[in-house]
Amino acid sequence: MTQQGNSGERKPRGKGPKRPRKPKVDPFSIGELEITDYKDVKMLRRFVSDTGKILPRRRTGLSAKHQRRIAQTIKVARQLALLPYTEKLVRK
């Protein structure tokens, strides 16, 4: 039997040209931010998604050490009800 149409060969799907990305800089390393305490909710919100999840390192650009400290600080703020565990979802 022969295949009709497609001869069995697949063309590689190109994702397009790769753009050089700007390296992310850890704001705590350069002194822009300081992990002061759990009460600085405005600073902690930068590292929480719209749904209330802690953002990963690849999105925040933090070092592993600072990511762990931020995660612990966010968890303390959640326990004290300064940050919500989840955001309310609005269904349409």
UniProtKB/Swiss-Prot annotation:
Bilayer-spanning residue ranges: none
Pfam families: Ribosomal_S18
Renumbered residue ranges of the record's region Disordered: 1-28
GO cellular component: cytosolic small ribosomal subunit
Name the UniProt record assigns to this protein: Small ribosomal subunit protein bS18
Taxonomic source organism: Deinococcus radiodurans (strain ATCC 13939 / DSM 20539 / JCM 16871 / CCUG 27074 / LMG 4051 / NBRC 15346 / NCIMB 9279 / VKM B-1422 / R1)
Entry-linked NCBIfam families: S18 (TIGR00165)
Biological process per Gene Ontology, one example term: translation
GO MF annotation, one: small ribosomal subunit rRNA binding
Swiss-Prot/TrEMBL keywords: Ribonucleoprotein, Ribosomal protein, RNA-binding, rRNA-binding
Family assignment from sequence similarity: Belongs to the bacterial ribosomal protein bS18 family.
SUPFAM superfamilies: Ribosomal protein S18
Function statement: Binds as a heterodimer with protein bS6 to the central domain of the 16S rRNA, where it helps stabilize the platform of the 30S subunit.
Composition bias type Basic residues, residue spans: 12-22
Quaternary context: Part of the 30S ribosomal subunit. Forms a tight heterodimer with protein bS6.
